Every structure is written in structure tokens, then in C-alpha cells.
């Protein structure tokens, strides 16, 4: 036991010693570009963060902090200077790209952090690996690709987002196309959502108007649905919609090995077409005027719910190896 404690102590002291010996070297690059209306900014970065800040003039100002870490100051400087940043202006488009020269080092590191001040009407196209992206507001079409990093977006009008092995937190977006895998997704208010999700640990939407999704190995939770939700190929997953607006138009789900929970109440009026193979259909307090049939291992229910004899809204759920809950 004493020998084990001594070994652990020596390892800890070695780790502390190597950390204490690490030196940091920083250098900055600042470039300013004059642009016209609706300029474009395209950035491709890795091993660092991208921050977009809204400015008040017709300029795009790019500030890049390059950081090197090494056992000596000379090593740290050499690692920082082994990062190249190419910034250019072509017409009304600013482009930036970082490249890292290949070097072999021990107990060292490099990073490139961007802070970019842009006009409000800028069109953004951002890509980052091994780092986060921060955007307060995007009034023009936005394209973001982030891998091994997180996206924090406050507000956007139209956005195309690809995220993998990270997280995406989007507070508000009118039209969002989101493709994600092995990530955590948190959405606030979205007008229209389309996309694919696979192996996402968290996928939560506070409020959505219309959504069209394909999902695999992901639990999707929608707190409130206003108009329509179409989920195709819900495989080894789950869908839970907490609250559905009375004036909704459509819910359509094709599921396998997944449970489907829809927050429908006796106050809703809709046409139901439900089929559960190797599963059950649970209607709760709903009064569905329906023909409830069973064929082999398949339960089927077709009919209408609510006061209207010919309701406009439609609920269609086809499931295999999973239950359907309308309550």
C-alpha cells in the first residue's frame, strides 16, 4: 500500500512539474476590410474558437490570436509561428483559412482564436473543427459546420447547420436546416425545422411551428408543436411531443423500435390513422370514433376525434416494435 501511494505521488508530482514548465507564446493578426451591402464572410478554422460580433460600420475586422504552448519559450514561439492564417478580400467577399504546419512535439499545443466584427447584413459561412462558434445574431442566410466543437447561436433568420461530436444551442431561428450526429441539440423557438439526427444524446425543442425530421438512435422531445410534424424513419429512438396547438394540421410518424408520445387532449379534433405492429395503441382520455381492428400481431385504429365530423387535422402513426401514446 505504501509503495502504491508513493508511486501515485511521484506520478502526480511529475504531472505537476510538466504542467508548471509549460510556456505560452501569443501573437496577434489584425486585418480590416471595407465592404459594401450584404458582404460575405467565409472562415475555415481548427483548434480554436470563432466569435462573430456585430459592428456599426461597413467594415469586416478580423482579429486572430495565435497561441503556442511548449516546454520552453522558444518552443512555444515556434509552435505559434507554425500556424498560417490566410485572409483575403475578393469583390465583396472576405475569406479566412488557418493551416497548421506538421510538427512533432511533446507536451505542446497550438490554437487560433478568431474574433470578427461584421456589419449586421453580413452573409456568414463558418467551419470549425476542435473549437466552438459563437454568434449573437445572423440576419442573412447562415451556414455553419462544426466538428468536435459547439455552436452557440442566439438568433438567425435562415440557417444551415451541420454539427457532429459536439453541441448546438440555438435560441431562435425562423428557418433551420439541422443535420447532427453524436451531439447534443437544444433549440428554443424555431419556425420551420428540417434535418437529420443520428446518435444524438439530447435533442430538445422548446417550440416549433413545422418540422420534418429523420431520426436514428435519438430521443426527440418537443415541448410545444404549433402546426405540423413529420418524422420519417424514427429508428431505435423516441418521439415525445408535450403540447400540441389546437389548430395543428398534421402529425405523421413512421417508427420502428421506438415509442411515440403525442400530447393530444379531448379538445383536439383530428382524423387518426394508427398502426402498431408488435406494439400497443394507448388513447387515454380521447374519445375516438373509430374502427379498432387487430390483424395478427398488428393493432390498427382509424377514425375521428373531437367535435368535428370531418376535422382538418390528421394524425398518422405507423410503428413496429413500439407503442403509440395519444395522451
Region roles according to the model:
Residues 1-327:
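Intrinsically disordered, low-complexity terminal regions
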Amino acid at each position: 500500500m505504501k509503495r502504491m501511494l508513493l508511486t501515485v505521488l511521484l506520478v502526480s508530482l511529475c504531472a505537476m512539474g510538466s504542467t508548471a514548465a509549460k510556456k505560452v507564446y501569443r501573437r496577434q493578426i489584425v486585418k480590416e476590410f471595407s465592404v459594401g451591402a450584404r458582404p460575405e464572410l467565409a472562415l475555415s478554422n481548427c483548434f480554436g474558437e470563432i466569435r462573430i460580433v456585430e459592428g456599426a460600420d461597413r467594415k469586416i475586422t478580423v482579429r486572430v490570436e495565435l497561441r503556442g504552448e511548449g516546454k520552453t519559450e522558444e518552443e512555444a514561439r515556434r509552435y505559434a509561428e507554425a500556424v498560417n492564417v490566410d485572409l483575403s478580400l475578393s469583390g465583396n467577399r472576405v475569406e479566412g483559412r488557418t493551416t497548421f504546419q506538421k510538427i512533432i512535439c511533446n507536451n505542446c499545443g497550438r490554437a487560433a482564436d478568431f474574433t470578427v466584427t461584421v456589419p449586421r447584413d453580413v452573409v456568414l459561412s463558418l467551419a470549425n473543427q476542435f473549437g466552438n462558434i459563437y454568434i449573437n445574431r445572423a440576419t442573412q442566410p447562415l451556414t455553419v459546420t462544426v466538428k468536435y466543437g459547439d455552436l452557440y447561436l442566439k438568433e438567425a433568420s435562415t440557417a444551415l447547420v451541420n454539427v457532429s461530436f459536439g453541441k448546438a444551442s440555438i435560441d431562435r431561428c425562423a428557418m433551420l436546416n439541422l443535420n447532427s450526429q453524436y451531439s447534443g441539440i437544444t433549440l428554443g423557438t424555431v419556425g420551420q425545422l428540417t434535418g437529420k439526427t443520428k446518435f444524438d444524446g439530447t435533442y430538445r425543442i422548446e417550440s416549433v411551428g413545422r418540422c420534418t425530421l429523420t431520426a436514428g438512435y435519438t430521443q426527440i422531445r418537443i415541448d410545444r408543436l404549433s402546426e405540423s410534424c413529420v418524422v420519417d424513419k424514427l429508428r431505435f429512438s423516441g418521439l415525445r411531443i408535450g403540447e400540441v396547438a389546437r389548430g395543428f394540421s398534421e402529425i405523421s410518424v413512421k417508427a420502428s423500435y421506438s415509442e411515440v408520445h403525442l400530447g393530444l387532449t379531448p379538445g383536439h379534433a383530428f382524423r387518426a390513422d394508427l398502426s402498431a405492429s408488435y406494439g400497443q395503441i394507448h388513447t387515454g382520455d380521447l374519445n375516438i370514433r373509430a374502427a379498432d381492428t387487430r390483424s395478427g400481431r398488428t393493432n390498427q385504429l382509424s377514425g375521428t376525434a373531437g367535435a368535428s365530423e370531418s376535422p382538418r387535422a390528421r394524425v398518422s402513426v405507423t410503428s413496429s416494435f413500439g407503442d403509440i401514446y395519444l395522451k
